[in-house]
Amino acid sequence: MSKEVSEEGRHGKDYVDPPPAPLLDMAELKLWSFYRAIIAEFIATLLFLYVTVATVIGHKNQTGPCGGVGLLGIAWAFGGMIFVLVYCTAGISGGHINPAVTFGLFLARKVSLPRAVAYMVAQCLGAICGVGLVKAFMMTPYKRLGGGANTVADGYSTGTALGAEIIGTFVLVYTVFSATDPKRSARDSHVPVLAPLPIGFAVFMVHLATIPITGTGINPARSFGAAVIYNNEKAWDDHWIFWVGPFVGALAAAAYHQYILRAAAIKALASFRSNPTN
């Protein structure tokens, strides 16, 4: 690995790693772009929850054996909306739409602490509003069919559900890091759709695997918004899983990408050795 670092230094790079975000960047609180990004995260999460939870309720409301979109259609709704919304908001807020993604990027020093906290609050509020619209438009089936809330399915243990959420979120956040890696972005800059596409597809694939277990959280805002509006005891009993699992998965993905794939620790050591006066 150290050989790779030394060779990279000799031959130069065709990309530039952005500097790490400061932990407390209070200056950005004075910028309109900061608040514009928060609004973008709020609206994007609202739209995400409205479309996806409405799809879930609409499917469950069908009575025929061939009615509704099925598990595959639900997975496409979640993955497709992430693809669309990341494409629309990436240039404004980064297109997080998920506190676990924001947490992972914060750990990797991609965003500051104030921005991370503001994003998470906006995402949770947007999720509540999005599910609130679903309840307002589909009141009767919403109450009868579970409100799109995440719960542990019958036959699965809490540990299994937690593990599924950790692995599912790891897949998502790892894909986010890989799709937005500076090296990849520089070499694929002529195809701007490449970052949102694998992220949306990762969400789609994880839903296929995890819907039978937990309904698929991998997004604490999605789970929180549905739990708040549905306000059912079972949803709240299981709710901690949909925060702990995604945050642990995001932590693991950030560590794997930054310290194993990108060898951040080795590069920092090499930089220190080449500049001993720093």
Curated annotation (Swiss-Prot):
The keyword tRNA-binding does not apply. Residues 58-74, 138-158, 214-240 are extracellular. It is a multi-pass membrane protein. Expressed in roots and floral buds. GO terms for cellular component: plasma membrane. Keywords: Acetylation, Cell membrane, Membrane, Methylation, Phosphoprotein, Repeat, Transmembrane, Transmembrane helix, Transport. The chain crosses the membrane at residues 37-57, 75-95, 117-137, 159-179, 193-213, 241-261. It holds the Pfam family MIP. PROSITE patterns: MIP. It comes from the Eukaryota. The modification N-acetylmethionine is found at residue 1. The modification N6,N6-dimethyllysine is found at residue 3. GO terms for molecular function: water channel activity. Belongs to the MIP/aquaporin (TC 1.A.8) family. PIP (TC 1.A.8.11) subfamily. Aquaporins contain two tandem repeats each containing three membrane-spanning domains and a pore-forming loop with the signature motif Asn-Pro-Ala (NPA). NCBIfam families: MIP (TIGR00861). This is Probable aquaporin PIP2-8. It comes from Arabidopsis thaliana. The gene is PIP2-8.
